[in-house]
Amino acid sequence: MTKNKQKGLIYATTTAFLWGILPIALIGVLVTIDPFTTTFFRFLIAAVILTPALICKGKLKHRKKYFEKKIILQFSIAGVLLCINYALYIFGLNKTSAEAAQVMMQVAPVCLLLAGVFLFKERFSKTQWLGLIIFISGLIMFFSPRYEDVFTELNTYGSGLMILLAAALTWVFYAIFQKTLLKDFSAQETMVVFYWIGVLFFFPLSTFESLVNLTTFQWLLVIFCGLNTLVAYGSFSEALTHIEASRVSAILATTPLITLVFVQISPVTVLIPEPLTLTVILGAFFVVTGSIITSSAKN
C-alpha cells in the first residue's frame, strides 16, 4: 500500500470516527441549550479557527472570485442548504437517538447516487441496485421495534425520523451545488465561506441566556462539537485527495456502527440507547453493507 493510500485511509477513518461520536456529544449539550445555539457555536468555532489558518498558509487563492455575482449566488444557495441540513439534523436528533440519526443520514449518499441516475443520466449497475435493496431492508429491520412510533402514531420519535430524512435530502441538494463550486475553489475555500454563512444564519436564532447553565463538561462538549465539525470535514476533504471517492464512501458508511458501539460506553449520562435486539443489530449491518455496495460497485 502506498503512503498516499495509507494517508487517505487514515483521514477517512478519522472522519468516520468523528462523525460517529458527534451525535453523542450533541445530545449531551442539547439537554441545556437549544439546537440553534448549539449549531451556531459549531459554525463559529470552525470559522474562527479555519479562517486565519487559511490566510496564514496562503490557501485562499481565489479570493477575487468570491465577489462574482454567479459565485455569490451559488455560495448563498449552497450555504443556506447546509444550514437547513444542520438545523434539521439536530432537531431530528433531539427527537430520536444518536444511532437512529446516523442510520438515517446514510440515506443521503444513496440518494445522491440516485440523483446522478435520474438527473444526470448516470448508470446504476445491477450490483448497485442489489446494494440499494440491502440498504432499504436494513432500514426496515433497524426501525422494526419502533414500527408503531413511525408508521401508526407518528409520535415524537416518528416525526424525528421524518425530520432526519428531510435533513438527508437537503444534504443531497447541498452536495450538488457544492460540486459546481469545487470546479473553481478548493474544498477548504468553500467550507470557510459556508462556516461564516452558518454563523450569520444561526446568530439571530440563538438564545445565549442558557449558556450560564452549562457545566464544565458541557462546555467541553460544545468546544468538541465545533472542533469535530472542522476536523471531520477537513479530514474528509484530505481523504478524497488521496484515495478514490468510492473507498472514502465505504469507510464513512461504517459511521452508524461506530455510534452504536460508543453509545454503550459513553460518559454522557442522558443518552437513551436504541434497544439492541438481534434484528436491530443486523439492520445496522445491512444499512452499512448496502451503503458500501451501492457506493463502491462499478457503474
Where are these regions (language model features)?
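Hydrophobic/aromatic residues within transmembrane alpha-helices
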Residues: 29, 38, 42, 92, ...
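Helix-helix packing/entry segments at the starts of transmembrane helices
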Residues: 14-16, 41, 100-107, 177-198, ...
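C-terminal-most transmembrane helix of multi-pass membrane proteins
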Residues: 43, 144-145, 218, 253-299
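Transmembrane alpha-helices of multi-pass small-molecule transport proteins
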Residues: 32-84, 111, 115, 169-177, ...
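C-terminal transmembrane-helix exit sites in multi-pass transporters
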Residues: 49, 109-133, 257-282
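Transmembrane alpha-helical segments that form core, pore/gating elements
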Residues: 12, 24-27, 50, 112-114, ...
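Glycine-/small-residue-enriched transmembrane alpha-helix faces in small-molecule transporters
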Residues: 1-40, 88, 150-180, 221-222, ...
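Specific transmembrane alpha-helical segments of multi-pass solute transporters/efflux pumps
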Residues: 21-23, 58-105, 141, 223-243
